[in-house]
Amino acid sequence: MKQSHFFAHLSRLKLINRWPLMRNVRTENVSEHSLQVAMVAHALAAIKNRKFGGQVNAERIALLAMYHDASEVLTGDLPTPVKYFNSQIAQEYKAIEKIAQQKLVDMVPDELRDIFAPLIDEHAYSEEEKSVVKQADALCAYLKCLEELSAGNNEFLLAKTRLEKTLASRRSEEMDYFMAVFVPSFHLSLDEISQDSPL
């Protein structure tokens, strides 16, 4: 049997820090970000289905979200101001991401490739799946801003404002529900979120 370096590469996502140009009270790596995006994307899909008549596969969306930044293990996490400095850079970075995604897919053993390729290659996502994952990704970045700001780090103030605009542009009923029901707790301390349910 031929060896594959696929999961050895993915395990290194924990070594790539997000927000590299920002001073962080607590650093966040791509691996933990991906888990949070997967949880939030799953919640958005479940809310969409249960409350607003959606027909999306919540489990598949959670998997897509789990792998949505996998290519960063080869490209690194390019800071947003650099990535979107102009349309040419954004377009070139998309091309680099596509190459990195294909390189990861090529690491998967042949007999498993048809399982993992549609999770890593974002071109295999439906528009609706892509939309939910993008909403979750932006929501998690927004939540990171709230956490940093609540810890007194004003470095994230402009990022929060920028992300509020992004969230407004990606707005959906399920996101509105998530924002109303779950996000307010991110402004509270551990004692405040624990007092209703003591152990």
Curated annotation (Swiss-Prot):
The record marks 18 as: Appears to be important in orienting the phosphate for catalysis. Residues 30-142 form the HD domain. Pfam families: YfbR-like. GO terms for cellular component: cytoplasm. The keyword Cytoplasm applies. One of its GO terms (molecular function) is nucleotide binding. Substrate binds at residues 18-19, 33, 69, 77-80, 137. CDD domains: HDc. InterPro entries: HD/PDEase_dom, HD_domain, YfbR, YfbR/HDDC2. It catalyses: a 2'-deoxyribonucleoside 5'-phosphate + H2O = a 2'-deoxyribonucleoside + phosphate. It is an enzyme of class 3 (hydrolase). Keywords: Cytoplasm, Hydrolase, Metal-binding, Nucleotide-binding. It is found in: Cytoplasm. It comes from the Bacteria. Its cofactor is a divalent metal cation. Its EC number is 3.1.3.89. A divalent metal cation binds at residues 33, 68-69, 137. Belongs to the 5DNU family. NCBIfam families: PRK03826.1. Homodimer. Catalyzes the strictly specific dephosphorylation of 2'-deoxyribonucleoside 5'-monophosphates. This is 5'-deoxynucleotidase CKO_00504. It comes from Citrobacter koseri (strain ATCC BAA-895 / CDC 4225-83 / SGSC4696).
